[in-house]
Amino acid sequence: MTSDSSDTAKQIGSGQPSGSPADMRRRDGVAPEQEVDPASLETDEDDEARLPDLPDEPVDAVAEAPLAIGRAAIEHAVRHAPTSPGVYRMMNAARDVLYVGKAKNVRKRLSSYARPTGQVMRIARMIAATAAVEIVSTGTETEALLLEANLIKQLRPRFNVQLRDDKSFPYILITGDHWAPQLLKHRGAQSRPGRYFGPFASAGAVGRTITALQRAFLVRSCTDSFFESRTRPCLLYQIKRCAGPCTGEIDFPGYTALVREATDFLSGRSRAVKEDLARAMEQAAADLAFERAALYRDRLAALSAIQSQQGINPRTVEEADVFAIHQEGGYFCVEVFFFRTGQNWGNRAYFPRAEKSFTPEEVLGSFLAQFYDDKPPPRLILLSHRIEESELLAHALSIKAGCKVVVSTPQRGEKKELVAHALTNAREALGRKLADTATQSRLLQGLAALLGLPQPPQRVEVYDNSHIQGANAVGAMIVAGPEGFLKNQYRKFNIRSESLTPGDDYAMMREVLERRFKRLLTQKAADSRAAAEQDSAPQWPDLVIIDGGLGQLNAARGVVDALGLSRVSLMAVAKGPDRDAGRETLFLPDRPAIKLEPRDPVLYFIQRLRDEAHRFVIGSHRKLRRKDIREAGLQEVPGIGPARKRALLHHFGTLKEIERASLADLGKVPGISAESARRIFDFFHARPA
């Protein structure tokens, strides 16, 4: 989906080479994020992304002098532009990419921008900011379409429609490289042998489906190494979520039949699978094998649970993605439904960034090209609005998929009903987001009034750290703004300093803030809009909130003063006596402490910010701790020798199940006393600071 080596790049209006998108970002001074992993948590709440920032619509007309300069740069480009297909990039004087477009005839398209009249305000503003034009020639218009989508996603130009929060979709994989196939969730490249089923809209949907599939088909979910090490069935066999092929509880033909049934169900032959199970249940009952009949009954119930979770399932559509777009209040929402093998595998709402002057058809057309830039398309794509160049898009996607892809806007029948259902969801999702945004804006105004800020903060960063007696220490930053929590900009910081005293919360906070603000100070492109859209690092916060008391505030203030920062406002939030919510104390530099009424909406808002930071940092800490526990096994549990370790593993099967066990369950293990059970439970459930 990128241009090949035969493409020719021409630099118009500048002596610099065009370079790759990554090169262009490096040239603008944007370094890759080094600090942290932004994808530390997967939740269903991520399915609806935040509303994008809308570029301000100017009231006055664009000044004639900048327009004339921009047209001159474009006219210069026209004289050297090819009449063949290609992609062009409008760039400002700072080398930021303003717009990426494609054309069947590049010279003709650029000529339309050089006309002195007839431009809409959005185009006029873009022309006025243009200082140079870059052109990449392509062999065909289809190549130009694919390259345009790729560049928009990478460069995030200001005047393009931008697909936001486009994380990869999860799949279900039934492996094909082991005699006893495994059932698991999969993201990323589909390189492992086996059958892939998806995409699913969220990790939560996949997790629920896999759990139900285990109950219905008893296919294993353990790793191959764990499978090979078993001498007795694990807990999943005991609770009837695995057939136990690892220890011969089921033979090869029997397990193969279960895998085939699971594959058939995921492939759309669910009715036949359910009929076979119903017949087997009736036969077992007739043979007075009531325990076996009950097993078939439970498997049928698990299949029914899967289908009830899926909601609407089409009768005549086997494989399709359904897109519907709704516009309201200057914002757009695109709702996407995924149908595979006649089953609804979930939906997701997107809120693309686009100026108000774009039409829904324009936004949807650009959205689709970017959406399938890194995803395999289905054979049928159903749309709520007719888009320009739908045939060109279908041709490009057909080449990508290796089969014919149809892009259609249905007018009647079940396909029309599916689109209408998606449109209803788009309308409701955007309504919820607009309501949430209005509430958020009022709360930010109240926060600004409380703190004496000149205007409501557009970016609030909240910091917290977590550890257990200094071990697995981690700091975290969450971000909030007028659109709510910006989860794609959350960051975590593994505490690195070897000189830090274990458990020194103030030193941990200083390290986190120093790393964050020093990175901001070293960013050469802090004011680059493209960089700000790409990454959180170049964006300065208007307000920093610390989870802690006066000591944490002083630690943060020391960092800010040492770095000479005057633009960042600080506040610390200390929990009330007995850590009661509603009795918090707010600490500000050089001001008396503030205590708000328990029912004050602004206090509730501050609590939400603080609690979200706490949730995120605790999750990050637990991931580090679980990793250490997995690597160390039960060796680190005090008072647990080899005999008790074997007893625990024999009883529960896996370390994960031991970690999940209740105190009462641990006490049932032979050789484990009440005192040992308490010690084990406390080890796995120690509360981080």
From Swiss-Prot:
Organism: Nitrobacter winogradskyi (strain ATCC 25391 / DSM 10237 / CIP 104748 / NCIMB 11846 / Nb-255)
Residues of the GIY-YIG domain: 83-161
Oligomer status and interactors: Interacts with UvrB in an incision complex.
Top-level taxon of the source organism: Bacteria
PANTHER family: UVRABC SYSTEM PROTEIN C (PTHR30562:SF1), UVRC/OXIDOREDUCTASE (PTHR30562)
Coiled coil keyword on record: no
Alphabetized Pfam families for the sequence: GIY-YIG, HHH_5, UVR, UvrC_RNaseH, UvrC_RNaseH_dom
Keyword Cytoplasm found: yes
UniProt subcellular location: Cytoplasm
Cellular component, GO, one term: excinuclease repair complex
Membrane-spanning residues: none
Function (record text): The UvrABC repair system catalyzes the recognition and processing of DNA lesions. UvrC both incises the 5' and 3' sides of the lesion. The N-terminal half is responsible for the 3' incision and the C-terminal half is responsible for the 5' incision.
UniProt record, GO biological process: nucleotide-excision repair; SOS response
Protein name (database record): UvrABC system protein C
Gene: uvrC
